[in-house]
Amino acid sequence: MIYEICTLTDPGLTRDNNEDAIAVDTLTGLCILADGMGGYNAGEVASGMAAAFIKSEMACWLAQTGVNSSAKEVRRALEICVENANHSIFTAANSNPQYRGMGTTLVMGVFQGNRVTLGHIGDSRCYRMRGDTLVQLTKDHSLLQEQLDAGLISVEDAKTSLNRNLVTRALGVEEIVMVEVNEYRVEVGDRYLLCSDGLTDMVADEDITATMLGAGLLEDKAARLVQQANDHGGRDNISVVLALAKEGVVKRGVLSRMLGK
C-alpha cells in the first residue's frame, strides 16, 4: 500500500491570522493537523509547536523502525511524542505571560501498509471515505459531544448550539493530557480527510461526501472543500489533509537500507 497525500490551509474570510498548522512527512506516512487557541497569536504558536515537535520526533522514530514496527509500538510512540509536545507547549505557556492559556487541538495519522493509527485531542477530525460512504472516525472531545451522548440535545439543534466550539481536551493547556488513539485497517481506494472545525462547522457531511466522490485530483478536492467553507461564511481558519490509499509497495529509504530494515 502506498499513500498519496496533499494538504491545504486557508485563513478564511474573517480572521487576520491562521492559527491552524499542518505537518506531513510523506516518507513515513505521517500527517499532523493542529488548530490553536489563545489570544495575541498564542494559538498560532501552540499549533505550530505541536505540528513541528510531533513531526520531528515521530518521523525520526518511524524512519528508524520502518514497516517492522507493530501497531502497539506505533501507538506507544505516538503517545510519547504527544506527551512531550504537551509538556513543551505547557511549559512555554507558563513561562511567558503573553502565551498563558494557549493550547491546540490535534488530529494525526500514521499511514503504514494496510493500517492507519489515528491520534486526536479536541474537535479536529478524521473522516474515511470508503466506496461512497463517509464515516467520521474520531469523536470530538467537546461539551457539545458530551451533550449529544447524554441525549441532552438533538443532532439538529447541535448544528446551531453555542457550545459547538467548547473543547474538553486540548494539547498544552494542562500538565497532563490524554490522546485518544485508534487503529483501522486500510483498503485500496480509501480516502482519508483530516480537518479543523473551520471546515466541519461550515460544510455539511453530505457536501463533504459529494466533494470526496467528485472527479479530480486530491488537490482539486482539497481546494473545493476550502472554497465551500468560505462560500458558507469562512468564519474560521480552514485546514485539510487528504490521503489516498493506492496499491503498491513502499520503496525503502536510505536510512532503512543502512539499518538493514
Can you name each region flagged by the protein language model?
Residues 1-261:
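PP2C/PPM-type serine/threonine phosphatase catalytic domain
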